């Protein structure tokens, strides 16, 4: 078994953001093997993730992501507990993944409890109305409507969306894995997504006018 020294503990802490004692114990349990030590931290972290979720997370990062071509931009705030973790490569990579997810999947809310009650009611009513002509019992309609509402959440709520890099995993699971690995509470607080020209009425011109303007024949 390899002897665990201070440099090893420091290196694992810098890589994972986990606490010093947690890193030391993980390295000892893994016999000095870094890959195994990371796995130990991850497994222990998963069990503690729920407890960490209630801890104050007031540090973190506000990050931006501009999609290729400059037509989509994202600002996102992701919080953690300490400035040390906020500066680690692992946390910053997570924030970048979250920003890219927002750019690609266009969520409207972070989590489902942020969806206004009137929006939820409207979605349920639309789902029921679509099925009423099939003359199904109201209880069945309610069940079908709830299923459609789940699909709505998966489309428009960030934490319910499939991760664009690994679609078998939800974004909430990506966050849970990060909490397990890093050892701190991590929360997506808010985001803004911008699309070039969104909401603007574009001026329509015919091809003849465009050609004339380009040739200097029309002012």
Swiss-Prot record:
<keyword id="KW-0963">Cytoplasm</keyword>
<feature type="region of interest" description="Involved in Mg(2+) ion dislocation from EF-Tu">
    <location>
        <begin position="82"/>
        <end position="85"/>
    </location>
</feature>
<dbReference type="InterPro" id="IPR018101">
    <property type="entry name" value="Transl_elong_Ts_CS"/>
</dbReference>
<dbReference type="InterPro" id="IPR009060">
    <property type="entry name" value="UBA-like_sf"/>
</dbReference>
<dbReference type="GO" id="GO:0003746">
    <property type="term" value="F:translation elongation factor activity"/>
</dbReference>
<dbReference type="GO" id="GO:0005737">
    <property type="term" value="C:cytoplasm"/>
</dbReference>
<dbReference type="InterPro" id="IPR001816">
    <property type="entry name" value="Transl_elong_EFTs/EF1B"/>
</dbReference>
<protein>
    <recommendedName>
        <fullName>Elongation factor Ts</fullName>
    </recommendedName>
</protein>
<comment type="function">
    <text>Associates with the EF-Tu.GDP complex and induces the exchange of GDP to GTP. It remains bound to the aminoacyl-tRNA.EF-Tu.GTP complex up to the GTP hydrolysis stage on the ribosome.</text>
</comment>
<keyword id="KW-0251">Elongation factor</keyword>
<comment type="similarity">
    <text>Belongs to the EF-Ts family.</text>
</comment>
<dbReference type="InterPro" id="IPR036402">
    <property type="entry name" value="EF-Ts_dimer_sf"/>
</dbReference>
<dbReference type="InterPro" id="IPR014039">
    <property type="entry name" value="Transl_elong_EFTs/EF1B_dimer"/>
</dbReference>
<dbReference type="Pfam" id="PF00889">
    <property type="entry name" value="EF_TS"/>
</dbReference>
<keyword id="KW-0648">Protein biosynthesis</keyword>
């Amino acid at each position: 078994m390899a002897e665990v020294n201070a440099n090893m503990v420091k290196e694992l802490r810098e890589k994972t953001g986990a606490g010093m004692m947690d890193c030391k114990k993980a390295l000892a349990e893994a016999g000095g093997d870094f890959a195994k030590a990371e796995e130990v931290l991850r497994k222990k972290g998963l069990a503690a993730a729920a407890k960490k979720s209630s801890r104050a997370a007031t540090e973190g990062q506000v990050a931006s992501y501009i999609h290729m071509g400059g037509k989509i931009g994202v600002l996102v705030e992701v919080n953690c507990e300490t400035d040390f973790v906020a500066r680690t490569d692992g946390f910053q990579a997570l924030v970048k993944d979250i920003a890219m997810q927002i750019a690609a999947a266009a969520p409207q809310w972070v989590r489902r409890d942020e969806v206004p009650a009137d929006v939820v009611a409207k979605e349920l009513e639309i789902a029921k109305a679509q099925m009423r002509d099939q003359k199904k019992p109201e209880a069945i309609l309610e069940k079908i409507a709830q299923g459609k509402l789940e699909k709505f959440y998966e489309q428009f709520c960030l934490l319910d969306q499939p991760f664009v890099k690994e679609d078998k995993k939800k974004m909430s699971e990506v966050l849970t894995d990060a909490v397990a690995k890093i050892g701190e509470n991590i929360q997506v607080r808010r985001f803004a997504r911008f699309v070039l020209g969104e909401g603007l009425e574009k001026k329509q011109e015919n091809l003849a006018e465009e050609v004339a303007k380009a040739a200097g024949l029309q002012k």
